[in-house]
Amino acid sequence: MSRLATRFEKLQSQQRKALVSYVMAGDPQPQVTVPLLHKMVAAGVDVIELGLPFSDPMADGPVIALAAERALAAGTNTLDALNMVKEFREQDQETPVVLMGYLNPVEVIGYEKFVSYAKQCGVDGLLLVDLPPEESKEFGAILKQHDMDQIFLLAPTSTDQRIQHVANQASGFIYYVSLKGVTGAATLDTSEAAARIEKIKGMTNVPVGVGFGISDAASAKAMGSVADAVIVGSAFVKSFATLAADEAVEQTVNKVKELRAALDELV
């Protein structure tokens, strides 16, 4: 059983919700990332989503786009991000790590070479924002050969046909985008999201996580009440735009504790 399946099964047996945290690899400096991941896990993160820095992150709002700029300016590339997972695995063999990024850097390395090395480093799954399920047959087959999960996005605008298509292909978890727009958007319609998540869960046994717009205890609880996981990115990443690295790490860890406590109130 994969690390993701094991983690979700354990949480479901405890009637707890998964907290999935997004971190941009190499932001603000490469040496910050791995210690930050360990601290976030200790504070209550269940699954890590590690962003691959890319120069044209079209699905990301300004917070994460700027994080990618900082990481690239600090010299972080795709292979560096994979090596961060490898270093993380020296101390943590249990916490699932999913890479989130864009197709171009993966194509530059080559599908087989990238996936093979990612697996070797301890990566559990991959979400490529600009690779829709209709075009992912070749890449998905390579992931399957290496026992890695392929995670897809669904949105408020997704048709029933698209939902079913993703439900048939996805593994690990499905990422439901709770807002129309880019990451870090401000307003969250919990009732609409709840209805859509119920619909998705009616079509698949794959866990459903919800992200975009979750930034505090109230929104985490609202989404956690209907989804298997809440996915938080911009609320963590934004600290690194304005604070010194050590202060930003401390603020991020405190935010993890706040969200973890909120989700655990749902038990």
Curated annotation (Swiss-Prot):
GO CC annotation terms, alphabetical: cytosol
Pfam families, A to Z: Trp_syntA (PF00290)
Keywords per UniProt: Amino-acid biosynthesis, Aromatic amino acid biosynthesis, Lyase, Tryptophan biosynthesis
Coiled coil: none
Subunit structure: Tetramer of two alpha and two beta chains.
Family per record: Belongs to the TrpA family.
Name of this chain's protein: Tryptophan synthase alpha chain
Encoding gene (name): trpA
